[in-house]
Amino acid sequence: MSDAQTPRPRYKSDLIYGLDDRPHFSAAIFAALQHVLASFVGIITPTLIVGGVLGLESEVPYLVSMALFVSGLGTFVQARKFGPVGSGLLCLQGTSFSFISVILSAGFMVKARGGGTDEILSTIFGICFFAAFIEVVLSQFIGKLRKLITPVVTGTIITLMGLSLIKVAVTDMAGGYGASDLGAAGNMGLAALVLLTIVVLNRFNNPFLRLGSIVIGLTLGFVVAWWMGRVDLAALPHLPLISVPVPFKYGFSFDWVAFIPVAVIFLISPLEAAGDLTANSMISQQPVKGPLYINRIKSGLLADCLNSVMAATFNSLPMVTFAQNNGVIQLTGVASRYVAYFIAGLLVLLGLFPMIGAVLQLMPKPVLGGATLIMFGTVAVAGIK
């Protein structure tokens, strides 16, 4: 069946720029910035959690830089498509929260036997390096599993992912997990301001307002939060000017006992990735059945594998296809794969120059929650449709 004959999803996303369109530079960089702002926290949070819980605070700034650096490289691979590797879609790469518990378990296992920082990290990255190849095997059977990857199955997965993300967004709107002022009126007011700004701007027919709705909403929220005294620029950490990527900086170790739980998650994560890629295809007005669709899923999983291997090599946690940016595509109407190149470049810069990322980390949780709630809501709606 040719691409032209492949059925398209009956889903209206009202795109300004389609998958193969090339937006002019200003539109592309503006759209890319919104994807980065929407996904930045999700990319670095697993690293912050793992580093904090395992007591690796001294290495966290470097690990965060590498998470952003590898996310940029992985996003480029996924969108650019190198032979059979890469879906060719505007898909960001980041670490799934499902990996956190098993990685923490591996870290505590090494710590219990007296292992230091280097041994903990070398073991984590070593087992993730080998476990990533499981996705290569699974990707080869995607064609045979097409009867299982039905619209009902993928739609259910997408909806559940959207609902789980909505929970995160609502928590952020209230002030963030563990906040002393959780649910305070000031937090909810900031979140409502950002959310309403994005919704109102999306009602205009002006492409610029729609394209910039997320950046405008976040900027307005950040400025108001600063005016309210909720942004402390003095809290910026003292970081090196440049973080240099060093392959296997902490060494390379392996542990069978720690490997098995991580391998199990790698067996499950392709199903989540298939849902993310399906949602992206729907919103990008691409087929969600037929040979082209199956090949995209297969190639996307291969890219996830390569990116996870690359992540372990450059001292970062496993990389998978992110669901967060699907909502950005729908809100902005920009599905162009070429925008992914700009996203990749911005993420690499954030990784190499950690001070930029540190400034973005000052974004108050309610401001971010107001923007992500509407984006994650569109992911859930895509699954229902």
Identify the meaning behind each predicted range.
Residues 2-4, 53-62, 182, 186, ...:
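Flexible hinge motifs at transmembrane-helix junctions and intramembrane kinks/re-entrant loops
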Residues 25, 51-86, 264-337:
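Membrane-embedded helical hairpins/re-entrant loop segments and their flanking transmembrane helices
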Residues 46, 69-74, 94-110, 160-165, ...:
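Hydrophobic alpha-helical segments within and immediately flanking transmembrane helices
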Residues 2-90, 101-113:
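N-terminal signal-anchor module of multipass membrane proteins
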Residues 58-63, 84-99, 147-155, 210-215, ...:
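Short, non-helical or kinked segments that cap or interrupt transmembrane helices
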Residues 108-234, 342-385:
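Membrane-embedded alpha-helical modules
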Residues 22-30, 50-60, 78-87, 110-123, ...:
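Short juxtamembrane and helix-loop transition motifs at transmembrane-helix boundaries
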Residues 1-30, 234-248, 282-299:
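Intrinsically disordered, low-complexity non-transmembrane regions of multi-pass membrane transporters
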